[in-house]
Each structure stands twice: as C-alpha cells, then as structure tokens.
C-alpha cells in the first residue's frame, strides 16, 4: 500500500509545531479535512513557507504518518491576497473558515463544501469599501449551513408548516425565530400551533424576513427588487447586521461552539450587542 497520496486543498488553520514546522488543517474536495505537518515551513527560506499560509490552495503530495501526515510537496494553484489587505475581510474569511471546520468531516469527499467556501471567499475579496460585510456573511453562513443539512426553515412555520410571508402593511407585524425549533415560528394569534411553542430567540420584522427568505438564492438579493420603496431606508444596514448575528447564533447553538473571528468582525464594525 502506498504511503503517500495526492490532494488538492485550501489551508483553513495553521499553528506552530516543533522548532520550525507548521501544523495545518486543510479542506480537500477529495479527502475532507486533513491535518498535516509542513516541515520547516517557519524557516525564512523554506519553499513551503508561503504555501502553508491561510487560504492558499495547493496541489499536495502528502506522506502518511503514524499520528500526523506530512506534506512533502505543495504547488500553489490559487490564493486570496485581497483578504489579507483589509482586516475586516480577513476576519470575515477566518469566521467562515471556523464554521467550515465545524461542518466538514475527515476521510470523506467534501467537494460541494469546498467549492462553496471558495466562492464566498472570492466574494469577500471583491467587496468594495462601501458594501456591507454583514450581508455577504449572512448569505455565506446560510449557504454553508444549508449544504451541511442544518439550515433553518425560513419559508414555513416550523410548527404548523404554514407558509409565511412578510407583512409590510403593519409596522408592528413580527414573526418568531427559534434555534430549538429550527427556524420560523408564526406568532399570529389567528393560527395558533397545536404543539408547545419552543423558545423564541428573536423576532423579525417584514424587512428582515424578506431578506432572510432570499438568502437561499445564488446571489445576494437586491433590496430595490424585493422591498417596497418605503422600506429602503437606514434600517436596511441594521437588518443585515441583525440577520448575520441571528444566523451566527443559530449556527453556534447547533454546532456547540462559538466563532472568535466573528467577534473581531463586530469589533471592527464598531458594533455592541
């Protein structure tokens, strides 16, 4: 049996190990998560130094080890240099990497997850200075949770299975969102559920629900195309922040861990919760 194997993968995490080595966690479409040592990667003249950095995609030759595999060759295919040029984008990319590390598994193909992460990292790179990181993060988290099979239900009530649509005619209208329930909960007294209502973690208004229900599409919704003109106001930016935080907390609830890089995104945005 061969003691080496080939893989293509993106570096999601790295840490020093030994005197000059680096321990990396890689997402590979063929093999899923791989943990491997990059020998001498911390030496200034090492050929593998730049190839073992965060978000670099390589063709790899890996030697199997008793406890840890070892990367013996790496040829870079792609990287995301613009992420490291702006701290907010870098923190956002690390946030997505933390989420993917929770969702991915080892020794199983993860091609769909791999391609989706690459696409959302590319979108983060392309965000202009006037665009919201939170809107892109909200959709990225929604897509990643959906592909892992734990995405929230956002079109029907989780208890009654009644279709829910945003009510823009009543400014006081709200719909509930429950982490335990798995998504939306109808709060209307006209159609009460027959089963006990789980804890409501957040109430959403019409703008937030409309945006949330469009996150499943391939690209971000254009507010002017889905919202009435009177809803295109300053609250739109707040709505994206609230939705990103909602989906983050939903993911943390179901995965049982927090994302430290997301807290840095909040700090850089000047947000307090």
Curated annotation (Swiss-Prot):
SUPFAM superfamilies: ArfGap/RecO-like zinc finger, Nucleic acid-binding proteins. Keywords: DNA damage, DNA recombination, DNA repair. Pfam families: RecO_C, RecO_N. GO terms for cellular component: bacterial nucleoid. The keyword Ligase does not apply. One of its GO terms (biological process) is double-strand break repair. Gene3D superfamilies: Nucleic acid-binding proteins (2.40.50.140), Recombination protein O, C-terminal domain (1.20.1440.120). Belongs to the RecO family. Involved in DNA repair and RecF pathway recombination. NCBIfam families: reco. This is DNA repair protein RecO. The lineage of its organism: Bacteria, Bacillati, Cyanobacteriota, Cyanophyceae, Oscillatoriophycideae.
């Amino acid at each position: 049996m061969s003691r080496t194997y080939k893989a293509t993968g993106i570096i999601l995490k790295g840490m020093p190990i030994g005197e000059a080595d680096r321990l990396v966690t890689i997402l590979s479409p063929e093999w899923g998560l791989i943990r491997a040592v990059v020998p001498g990667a911390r030496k200034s003249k090492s050929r593998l130094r730049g190839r073992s950095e965060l978000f670099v995609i390589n063709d790899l030759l890996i030697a199997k080890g008793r406890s840890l595999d070892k990367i013996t060759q790496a040829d870079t295919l792609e990287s995301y240099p613009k992420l490291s040029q702006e701290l907010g984008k870098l923190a956002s990319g690390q946030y997505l990497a933390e989420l993917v590390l929770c969702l991915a598994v080892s020794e199983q193909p993860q091609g769909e997850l791999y391609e989706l992460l690459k696409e959302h990292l590319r979108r983060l790179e392309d965000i202009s200075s006037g665009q919201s990181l939170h809107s892109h993060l909200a959709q990225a988290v929604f897509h990643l949770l959906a592909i892992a099979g734990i995405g929230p239900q956002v079109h029907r009530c989780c208890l009654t299975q009644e279709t829910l649509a945003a009510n823009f005619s009543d400014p006081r209208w709200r719909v509930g969102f429950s982490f335990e329930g798995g998504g939306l909960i109808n709060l209307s007294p006209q159609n009460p559920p027959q089963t006990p209502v789980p804890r409501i973690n957040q109430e959403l208004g019409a703008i937030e629900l409309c945006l949330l229900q469009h996150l499943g599409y391939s690209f971000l919704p254009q507010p002017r195309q889905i919202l009435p003109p009177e809803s295109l106001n300053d609250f739109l930016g707040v709505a994206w922040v609230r939705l990103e935080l909602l989906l983050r907390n939903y993911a943390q609830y179901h995965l049982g861990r927090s994302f430290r890089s997301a807290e840095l995104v909040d700090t850089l945005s000047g947000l307090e919760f």
